[in-house]
């Protein structure tokens, strides 16, 4: 009886190993036939043209968006929050894949700028970009260029070097806000 039990025990282990090999072979075949592109960029670009057109009719300030950036720049995020200070956001990766964002809001600059620039501080310096005087803010994580406007603030911020922030600020174009319907 012990010989029969021993033989059954060995068969059970052998059957388990064979089953595992069959399952692994099936998984390998399935993996081979699933399409994949190892060279594809994992960061998806977003098209912000529809959101921009919508926000330009809804926002109470001239909404800024870049025009003419090099093709290596990639828009990665877009949103508008009409509840939280009419906040407009466009996120980009520059040619070196560093983050640059355009932020606009009617929230007071003293509150808004440190929030979107991850606690950057005003240096007291300014820089003229495309004929406009931008405040220079610097921080541990992000630097920022800040353009105070009438009832709103525009911020170009991110982890990218200052040259990329300046390039974005120079590319920004605005259209006046839509007139309210009467």
PLM regions: where:
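A short, solvent-exposed beta-edge/loop patch
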Residues: 31, 35, 123-182
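Short, solvent-exposed recognition patches
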Residues: 47-140
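Generic hydrophobic secondary-structure signal
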Residues: 17-33, 69, 90-92, 100-102, ...
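Charge-rich, low-complexity N-terminal segments
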Residues: 1-72
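Generic serine detector
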Residues: 6, 19, 77, 105, ...
């Amino acid at each position: 009886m012990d010989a029969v039990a021993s033989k059954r025990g060995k068969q059970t282990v052998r059957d388990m190993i064979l089953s595992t090999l069959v399952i692994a072979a099936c998984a390998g075949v399935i993996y081979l036939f699933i399409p994949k592109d190892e060279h594809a960029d994992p960061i998806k670009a977003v098209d912000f043209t529809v959101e921009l057109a919508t926000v330009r009719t809804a926002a109470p300030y001239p909404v800024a968006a870049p025009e003419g950036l090099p093709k290596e720049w990639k828009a990665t995020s877009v949103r508008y929050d009409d509840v939280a200070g009419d906040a407009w956001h466009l996120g980009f990766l520059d040619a070196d894949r560093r983050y640059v964002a355009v932020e606009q809001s009617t929230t007071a600059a003293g509150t808004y700028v440190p929030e979107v620039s991850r606690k950057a501080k005003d240096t007291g310096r300014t820089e003229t970009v495309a004929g406009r005087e931008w405040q220079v803010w610097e921080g541990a994580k992000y630097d920022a260029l800040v353009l105070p406007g009438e009832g709103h603030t525009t911020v170009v911020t991110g982890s990218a070097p200052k040259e990329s922030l300046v390039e974005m600020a120079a590319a920004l174009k605005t259209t006046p806000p839509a007139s309210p319907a009467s």
